[in-house]
A protein has these predicted regions:
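Short membrane-interface loop/juxtamembrane segments of multi-pass integral membrane proteins
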Residues: 112-134
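Transmembrane alpha-helical insertion/packing segments
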Residues: 1-58
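Alpha-helical transmembrane segments of multipass membrane proteins
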Residues: 21-29, 47-52, 84-88, 92, ...
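Functional transmembrane-helix hotspots
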Residues: 90-117
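Helix-loop junctions at the membrane-solvent interface of multi-pass transporters
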Residues: 31-32, 94-99, 159
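Membrane-helix interface/capping segments
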Residues: 57-73
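Transmembrane alpha-helical segments in integral membrane proteins
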Residues: 136-165
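Alpha-helical transmembrane segments of multi-pass membrane proteins
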Residues: 9, 13-17, 75-84
Length: 167
C-alpha cells in the first residue's frame, strides 16, 4: 500500500486519542503518588500497547475493510506512538509549568535519593537541579514513547495483520 493510501487524518485522530489516554494515565499516577515509582513506566508502556492494539483494530475495521498487512499495521502503530508522544510531551510542558507546583521538588528529591543510592558523586547529585528541565523531560518522553511504540508496533503487527503483506 502506498503511503498516500492511508487515511492520515483518521490515524492522527487515533494517535491524539491515544495521547489523551496516556495523559489521563499520567495524571492519575501523579495524583495517586506513584508517578515517580520505578515501575510506573511499565504502566505507561502498557497503556501505549493497548492504544496501538485498539487503534490498529479500529482503523482496520473502519478504513481497511477488515484487512491489514504487516507493513500497514506497523505504520499505523508508529503513527499512534509518535502522536501519543507528541501529546504527552505537550502535556509535560504545560503541566509542569502551570499545574503541578511541587513537581520539581518531588523530582529533585527522588532523583537525589536515587543518585545517592547509586553512590554518585556530590557533584553529579548537585548537577541534577541544573540539567533537568521541562523541555528535557518532554523530549525524553516523546523519544521514549516513539521508540518503544515502534518496537511494540513491530511485534503487535505480527498478530494484528489480517492478510498477507505485499510490502
Amino acid at each position: 500500500m502506498p503511503v498516500t493510501d492511508f487515511n492520515w487524518k483518521a490515524l492522527i485522530i487515533v494517535g491524539l486519542v491515544a495521547g489523551l489516554a496516556q495523559v489521563a494515565t499520567g495524571v492519575v499516577m501523579y495524583l495517586a503518588g506513584i508517578y515517580f515509582a520505578s515501575w510506573s513506566m511499565l504502566v505507561s508502556l502498557f497503556v501505549l500497547l493497548l492504544s496501538i492494539v485498539i487503534g490498529t483494530r479500529w482503523y482496520t475495521g473502519r478504513y481497511q475493510e477488515g484487512e491489514i498487512s504487516y507493513s500497514q499495521a506497523f505504520v499505523v502503530g508508529i503513527v499512534i506512538s509518535v502522536s501519543t508522544g507528541i501529546v504527552y510531551a505537550i502535556y509535560n510542558i504545560i503541566s509542569i509549568s502551570f499545574f503541578y507546583p511541587h513537581f520539581w521538588d518531588e523530582l529533585l528529591r527522588i532523583s537525589t535519593e536515587r543518585a545517592r543510592a547509586n553512590q554518585q558523586t556530590p557533584e553529579a547529585i548537585a548537577s541534577i537541579r541544573e540539567t533537568v528541565t521541562a523541555n528535557k523531560i518532554a523530549v525524553g518522553n516523546l523519544i521514549r514513547l516513539s521508540i518503544a511504540g515502534s518496537l511494540l508496533s513491530a511485534f503487535t503487527s505480527l498478530t494484528l495483520k489480517t492478510k498477507r503483506a505485499r510490502g
